[in-house]
A protein has these predicted regions:
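Nucleotide-state-sensitive switch-loop elements of NTP-binding domains
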Residues: 3-35, 40, 44, 49-133, ...
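Residues at alpha-helix caps and immediate loop-helix transition turns in enzyme cores, especially N-
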Residues: 45, 95, 147-150, 175, ...
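Cofactor-binding loop segments of dinucleotide-utilizing enzymes, especially the Rossmann-like FAD-
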Residues: 65, 140-141, 197
Length: 220
């Protein structure tokens, strides 16, 4: 039996997310929602991504979500990219209204790509639409290969799955073949990237995919 209060919260969120999406489309801005657990390397992937898209001549901004502090936004801003910090004050995810309230701080007409770095959590972020075009799920091999079984919604909702810290794979018990089989049955259409933000392994292919997303939305 569904709890009416939760249903109302999600319906209200979805309406605001739809309005956000229309605003993004009206301005020709591609929006990606980056999600992961804390410590998976999400901010490192954001930085590697902004380096790749900037090299392709794409203008962008970043919204960073955290319970507290401006640490991640400060790291992004150091690369000359506009960054807006959202502190949730305890909430384990961003929601569409938080994004709506942050957008006046960003000149959408001046950018082609907006990256939203969600709060580190494997449960709540997948439940709340923000108005994004694609969801990017990041997992590090040090977290273990059983996460899709424990947190299926996050993995089944993802449009792209980035497996980070591949440089440490040999030092873990992560079963890559078994993991890929689970993902293949759970989300057969997801695009998977094996990377290391430390060594640079796999980042060229990831950067090319990101640029492709911006180009495709720009053609609509």
């Amino acid at each position: 039996m569904e709890i009416p209060v939760l249903k109302n919260i999600l319906e209200t969120n979805d309406r605001i997310a739809a309005a956000n999406a229309r605003l993004f489309d009206d301005n020709g801005v591609t929006v990606l929602n980056f999600m992961s657990s804390p410590g998976a390397g999400k901010t490192s992937l954001v930085i590697k991504t902004l380096e790749a898209v900037k090299a392709a001549g794409i203008s962008l901004a970043v919204i960073d979500g955290d319970i507290a502090s401006t640490v991640d936004a400060d790291r992004v801003a150091a690369f000359g990219v506009p960054a807006v910090q959202i502190n949730t004050g305890g909430a384990c995810h961003l929601d569409a209204n938080m994004i709506k309230n942050a957008l006046p701080k960003i000149d959408l007409a001046a950018i082609e790509l907006l990256i939203i770095e969600n709060v580190g959590n494997l449960v709540c972020p997948a439940e709340f639409q923000l108005g994004e075009h694609k969801k990017v799920m990041l997992l590090s091999v040090t977290e273990g290969d059983d996460k899709p079984l424990k947190y299926p919604l996050m993995f089944s909702e993802a449009d792209a799955l980035v497996v980070n810290k591949m440089d440490l794979l040999a030092n873990t018990n992560f079963n890559m073949e078994g993991f890929q089989e689970i993902i293949g049955s759970m989300n057969p259409d997801v695009e998977m990237f094996l990377v290391s933000c430390t060594s640079g392994f796999g980042l060229d292919a990831w950067g090319e995919w990101m640029v492709k997303q911006v180009r495709e939305v720009g053609k609509k």
